[in-house]
From Swiss-Prot:
Component of the eukaryotic translation initiation factor 3 (eIF-3) complex, which is involved in protein synthesis of a specialized repertoire of mRNAs and, together with other initiation factors, stimulates binding of mRNA and methionyl-tRNAi to the 40S ribosome. The eIF-3 complex specifically targets and initiates translation of a subset of mRNAs involved in cell proliferation. Component of the eukaryotic translation initiation factor 3 (eIF-3) complex. The eIF-3 complex interacts with pix. Residues 240-268 have a biased composition (Basic and acidic residues). The gene is eIF3c. The lineage of its organism: Eukaryota, Metazoa, Ecdysozoa, Arthropoda, Hexapoda. This is Eukaryotic translation initiation factor 3 subunit C.
Amino acid sequence: MSRFFANGSESESESSEEEIQATNFNKASAFQFSDDEEEVKRVVRSTKEKRYENLTSIIKTIRNHKKIKDIPNTLSSFEDLTRAYQKALPVISKEENGITPRFYIRCLAELEDFINEVWEDREGRKNLSKNNSKSLGTLRQKVRKYIKDFEDDLSRFREAPDQESEAEDEVVALESDGGDAGDDSDAGVKPTEAVPKAVKSAPAKAAPADDDDSDDSIDWDSDSESETESSDDENQYQNMRERFLKRTTEKEEKDDDKRKDKRKEQKTKIRKRAEDDEDGEWETVVKGHVVEKPKMFEKDAEIDVPLVLAKLLEIMSARGKKRTDRRLQIDLLFELRDISDQHNLGTAVSVKIHFNIISAIYDYNQKISEPMKLEHWALLLEVMQSMMKLLLANADIIMSESVAEEHEEYATSPFYVRGCPLAAVERLDDEFVKLLKECDPHSNDYVSRLKDEVNVVKTIELVLQYFERSGTNNERCRIYLRKIEHLYYKFDPEVLKKKRGELPATTSTSVDVMDKLCKFIYAKDDTDRIRTRAILAHIYHHAMHDNWFQARDLVLMSHLQDNIDAADPATRILYNRMMANLGLCAFRQGNVKDAHHCLVDLMVTGKPKELLAQGLLPQRQHERSAEQEKIEKQRQMPFHMHINLELLECVYLVSAMLLEIPYIAAHEFDARRRMISKTFYQQLRSSERQSLVGPPESMREHVVAAAKAMRCGNWQACANFIVNKKMNTKVWDLFYESDRVREMLTKFIKEESLRTYLFTYSNVYTSISIPSLAQMYELPVPKVHSIISKMIINEELMASLDDPSETVGMHRSEPSRLQALAMQFVDKVTNLVDVNEKVFDMKQGNFFQRGNMGNRGDRGYNRNQNNQGGNWLGQRRDRNNRNRNQRGHHKNNQDRQQQQQQQVQTIDEE
């Protein structure tokens, strides 16, 4: 019976209580733990420890495979290592600040040395199995490819391989804690035994093994102890979750301190033992296989020119081949040069070695699009200048690419050496541009790299002197162009001082140098590209120094604008730069219309930044591929050669304002007027559509506000918007002689505001005084007289001048504002009527004008001849009626137009 019934017997209640006790005992035993499971302390490891332990275990496996030369398993373990390192990268970047752990670099260095050792052992390679041999090649390729990202770390490690880092100490700690530190640990520490962890247990008394009673008693005692401990645990852990949480005790911290002390003691013991073994002498021990530097010559060899040339040929024969150590090749060439100089083998041999060193430095960087390293760049400049000084100092050495290798002469003068210093200096110049593009233009690195231009130009000058002494016209044109490209964009203030007479006429300026170089190219060049680039650079340089007429004449005589579309992209970029600078020059000289014509093609596209190769605009997804973007980035100009885009846009908008506003005022009611500048017109219209216009802030807003003021004839407000502190800082102060430019701008604003005022209010005045206009616009009276006379001559203003009274009489031949609006309204209504009539005809057709066309017999169902003849007569009658109706309609239109003209005349008379 169930124990929940109140009227049960005692036996039933006792049995039920026994059942309840049994169930309680079973539940408790389900969560009972042994002594070992309870007392073993749970260790929570960090992500760093887990990742590092995974790496060290794989590294240990790789070392074991290397010992037995199990190459296939080494390959698979290496792949596992790379994957494990990839997983550990977030931890390394967070904990180690992105620095690769030293034990990982040590593993890579040992693996590289192992592969080199096995690979160089040719006899051993022959005895390898097919699987081992295949795995060795695969492993070698993968390791060489993988360690390219760790070159700097590997080089630093090989310089001091015996140093230990904190990461290696942690790895040793992990191995010592886990008890699996091998003999070949990274830090060189001897393996230590695992320290057993303290376990709480009751002291058990020793007893003989063959005593059954004692065994029973011991078992009984252990059972009782477990029961008491389980009851204690149940009292201690009220929640089951607390049983599995890590317990932090002071003993754990003490264990960590003891472990650290043991490691320190082991290190000190090893250090003392090493000092005792060294007997007072220090020796650097390099781990792994050491690749010895090949000997240049035998010990007793007689060093002469043929031997050195043979060695040079041997070194350079490895050029471009796989598995060639390019750094070692450069070092060998320098050593060979020193040996040649020590034995006085001649300047020709030294020049030959110099040229091969330059070629080896160029070959070091396999990717042409990437810049070379700075150490190689400095070395290249030094070697290049040294070679050219040797060539200039020895006139009997002829170095040319036309000299065949079998015709080289090193024994007797004249010496013939095969090589092309022109190609070397051109590549040097290209590498300099790559270095500039790679640097951040706003950093100090860019400035330090830009200082190297002095040495680059000096090297170009040395090559130029050499080819002026012995070189063909084509070679001289090429080296002249290189010098021009370093000179054309630089401003020389001495040119303007010479113009003003502040310097003597015999002073040589950059304009004179450009004239000399460019005129030689014009006369001697056989290729169109060099001549075209020389003309463009010449125009650019003239425009930069305000030689407007010389620059304009060069453009007109060369007809560059007709053939530039067929040129290469670099030449087209130079053409765009030339047109931009020519527009700035025209603006500085007061030729506003010419400045607008020069800049309109650049600015109307909205992409002047790309056209001038000063940056890439963000494109949509499929407008530019990755390859196209890479090519366009290579064409970009260095930052110090950029033209200020805001200055260009401001000059363009101001020029458009000075041209467009008077034109709009003169053709205000002309429905067919054209736009001079579409970009400026759009800016003006967008500003007029705004309901609330605040004070101008940007450069464009200043120009638009000035244009609105000019439309009203308010020249002072217009000038204040164009010439103010903010605009001076952004734009006008960038000009040389900026005060002169600001004065010129103010003068043009006054003149164009006067013209706009006359166009706008000519129908208001019967006559107007010239002195009052001069006073209003602060212009001289002769200047106002000249402006009005020009307007009358060009039939822009219908007026006449009265010189005695100094007045302008308005003829008022043009319609008034009301008349012009009425005429516009008449034209629009007439057009609307014509359109409505056409729409009505299209909807109704000619159905009612064709007589009996609705009869089915007229459509061909009745076939007799009489009906056909009658139908023909009806069609003729209908055609006559249509002609009569059209004549009547035309007459009605004429009458309507006459009535409208009479109404307009009546309005005028009233």
